[in-house]
A protein has these predicted regions:
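Non-catalytic, polymerase-adjacent accessory regions of viral genome-replication enzymes
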Residues: 1-32
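Charged boundary/loop elements
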Residues: 1-12, 81, 85-94
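Short alpha-helical scaffolding segments that buttress acidic/His motifs in well-ordered protein cores
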Residues: 3-7, 78, 162-167
Length: 244
């Protein structure tokens, strides 16, 4: 029931998938009947292909969007509710995209704080390396993703099977079916969480390259000042979605 209400509150909740069934149908169903339908779908999950649409980006290019059926969105939201707390407990602290109670402003504030703590004077330059993972959602390896889910703590094979089937559901474009061997559909409920799972090892690897071997103080600001006066330049990793 929570999953249904979460989907209902989403901006695109009234958009139908390839089956052309809208959210209103499920909202009009008796509660017990809807719960039985969701339970049955869990036991015999066969996701339908996503409906491919394109939305314009600010640079004039178009970004592909995969719109699952409403029932598939409800199933994905159920899975998200189950696995998100497990994943959150293992995520890198300075990862800010697609996470509860985190936003761009928190990433910006963290970056400003380490800059202010690390500068001897207002005129001291601070270097930043910006990276953008090209085609991040479209190039996620399904096998590696499932392995990372297992390592992060998702050990229920039924849940892993549902995620695997969702990844391989494909999409429909101009009445033609296209298989998906790589990537997670942009527009899928689970895709943002799965992208964070996939990039979590990267976050920890880069973050530990500098801070972990030098960590002595409880507070990061104190470590920054100590290393600064020792002549060691502090380095930090901040990521928001596919930008770091």
């Amino acid at each position: 029931v929570t999953a249904v209400h979460n989907i209902k509150s989403n901006k695109g909740s009234r958009t139908a998938g390839v089956d052309k069934i809208k959210m209103d149908k499920y909202l009009q169903m008796p509660k017990d009947e809807l719960i039985l339908l969701i339970q049955s779908s869990f036991r015999n999950y066969r996701p339908k292909p996503a409906r491919r649409e394109y939305i314009e980006k600010s640079n004039g290019k178009k970004r592909p969007l995969g719109i699952p059926t409403v029932l598939d969105r409800i199933i994905q939201e159920c899975v998200r509710i189950i696995i998100e707390p497990i994943c959150e407990a293992r995520f890198y602290p300075q990862s800010y995209g697609f996470r509860p109670y985190r936003a761009q402003k928190h990433a910006i504030r963290g970056i400003i704080n380490v800059i202010n703590a690390g500068c001897k004077s207002p005129d001291q330059p601070v270097w930043a390396i910006e990276g953008d993972i090209k085609g991040c959602f479209d190039n996620i390896n399904h096998r590696l993703l499932l392995q990372k889910l297992w390592r992060i703590g998702i050990h229920d094979k039924r849940v892993l099977k549902i995620i695997s089937q969702m990844l391989k559901a494909g999409y429909m474009e101009n009445d033609l079916f296209h298989a998906t061997e790589l990537g997670t559909p942009q527009g899928g409920i689970l895709s943002p969480l799965l992208s964070n799972v996939y990039l979590n090892d990267f976050d920890w690897y880069v973050g530990r390259m500098y801070m972990e071997p030098h960590r002595q103080c409880k507070h990061k600001g104190n470590d920054t000042r100590r290393l600064k006066w020792a002549g060691v330049t502090p380095k930090y990793n901040y990521r928001y979605a596919d930008d770091w």
